From Swiss-Prot:
Record keywords, A-Z: Cell membrane, Developmental protein, Membrane, Transmembrane, Transmembrane helix, Wnt signaling pathway
Protein name: Transmembrane protein 88
Primary gene name: TMEM88
GO cellular component, as recorded: cytosol; plasma membrane
Organism (species): Homo sapiens
InterPro entries to which the protein is assigned, alphabetical: TMEM88
Amino acid sequence: MADVPGAQRAVPGDGPEPRDPLDCWACAVLVTAQNLLVAAFNLLLLVLVLGTILLPAVTMLGFGFLCHSQFLRSQAPPCTAHLRDPGFTALLVTGFLLLVPLLVLALASYRRLCLRLRLADCLVPYSRALYRRRRAPQPRQIRASPGSQAVPTSGKVWV
């Protein structure tokens, strides 16, 4: 194969290094546990946001289905005292009409919360359990004494 100009060659010891088997197993368990905790928190947040925002539509649908004579024929006091079948039909129609816009609003607010809390950054890829990352050696910075000026080490100076 011909060398491609500008292509970087893999230098031995430059990339991630495989972990020991026991270390790999322990890290895999920890990574899985952390990802499950983040997923559980995501699910809890989703249920909380959807439950809060969709509550009016779900309440209307619940009372409409519970009290309408075509469905359950409940004789509970809230059903018989306040509305008749046309009122419960109106509750059903209004609940279904409100469901889609409130669902869009709830999902948009959940997405905004996830972005603000940066929940996707909490998920750890499984490759972290298999490989150790080597840190690139950082050049040591020499501190100048308070009375002297620091001399730039390279030929370029950014102003």
